[in-house]
């Protein structure tokens, strides 16, 4: 409880100021088609010198989501990071699951569910190769294990490739199989991609998770084609 309180105080005093979160996300947004344009030094100076930039992105995403969730939930358990004495990130704890696993109890705004948050920094060429399979696998196996089809995934990145959007949307109808047992499969996988530009809108517009959940659900149920879908269902509604 003491560590949680200490973390909350750090968050309240430093990170929940919109300007700080926004500024850090802004530095990540520079990583677009050429990954080298990323402002690593600026990012580290604002957060910590003790972690690599992808780990910092994960940490920032966790804090942003904790803020949007109105500081409900065991965020220190949900983030798969080892933290230093100041509760700043050091390393990612490797494992076969999503970067952040956020548990939500049922409320009037949404059913009980788990949200898998995947944080990826990539350039336009390697994102698809790096991330398509692990994201689908993490969510697919989670759904098969838990049986709760209300659970879903948010894929956060600095640059969204159109074919990444297309592949994630196709998971709405394409079954995912347990590779060890073909009798177990799930269809209707909900994967919502978010670019840092939209993460910044969550911060600047003070969006809460109870507002985001129905927005994501409506986006999932949309029949728009991928090249129209992100702009209409995500970007314009933030």
Q: What label would you give each PLM region?
A:
Residues 1-9:
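Mixed-charge (acidic/basic) macromolecular-recognition segments
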Residues 9, 13-238:
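Catalytic core segments in nucleotide and nucleic-acid processing enzymes
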């Amino acid at each position: 409880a003491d560590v949680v309180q200490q973390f909350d105080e750090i968050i309240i005093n430093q990170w929940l100021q919109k300007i700080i979160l926004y500024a850090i996300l802004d530095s990540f947004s520079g990583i677009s088609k050429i990954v080298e344009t990323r402002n690593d030094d600026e990012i580290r100076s604002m957060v910590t010198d003790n972690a690599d930039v992808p780990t910092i992105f994960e940490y920032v995403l966790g804090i942003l989501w904790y803020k949007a969730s109105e500081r409900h939930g065991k965020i220190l358990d949900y983030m798969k990071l080892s933290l230093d004495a100041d509760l700043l990130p050091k390393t990612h704890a490797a494992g076969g699951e999503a970067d952040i696993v956020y548990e939500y109890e049922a409320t009037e705004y949404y059913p009980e569910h788990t949200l898998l948050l995947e944080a990826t920094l990539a350039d336009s060429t390697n994102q698809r190769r790096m991330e398509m399979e692990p994201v689908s696998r993490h969510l697919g196996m989670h759904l098969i294990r838990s049986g709760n089809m209300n659970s879903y995934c948010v894929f956060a990145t600095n640059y969204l490739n159109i074919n990444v959007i297309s592949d994630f949307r196709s998971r709405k109808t394409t079954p995912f199989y347990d590779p060890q047992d073909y009798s177990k499969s799930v269809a209707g996988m909900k994967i919502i991609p978010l670019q840092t530009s939209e993460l910044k809108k969550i911060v600047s517009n003070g969006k809460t998770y109870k507002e985001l959940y129905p927005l994501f659900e409506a986006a999932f149920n949309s029949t728009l084609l991928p090249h129209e879908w992100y702009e209409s269902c995500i970007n314009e509604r933030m």
